[in-house]
A protein has these predicted regions:
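Intrinsically disordered, low-complexity linker/assembly segments
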Residues: 1-96
């Protein structure tokens, strides 16, 4: 897995679908302790972050671990089926 380290905090990205961003979802992400389940809240925006407290790198000066952040990237499909287009048009009429 690819982690970005900033101080004692770790950052990882996770791609999710548009529907998962709108409705919320549970996803598995890597951590230095192994895979972890993370709840992505409904309505999260692309590049929004979810914090995993204490799952970063140990900070020897403070005696605590940093945090891990999961940056959410929303995957916008380039192609839609006719059914998907119809459903999205219905949602558009509903104001979503």
């Amino acid at each position: 897995p690819f982690f970005k380290r900033v101080g004692s905090d770790l950052y990882v990205t996770k791609e999710i679908k548009v529907t998962e961003a709108l409705l919320g979802t549970d996803v598995e992400v890597p951590s230095i302790e192994g895979p972890k389940r993370v709840t992505i809240p409904p309505g999260i925006k692309s590049h929004g972050k979810v914090r995993l407290k204490g799952l970063g790198v140990p900070d020897t000066n403070k005696g605590i671990n940093g945090d891990q952040y999961v940056e959410v990237i929303i995957d916008i499909p380039k192609r839609l089926t006719d059914r998907q287009k119809t459903l999205l048009e219905e949602l558009k009429r509903e104001g979503i």
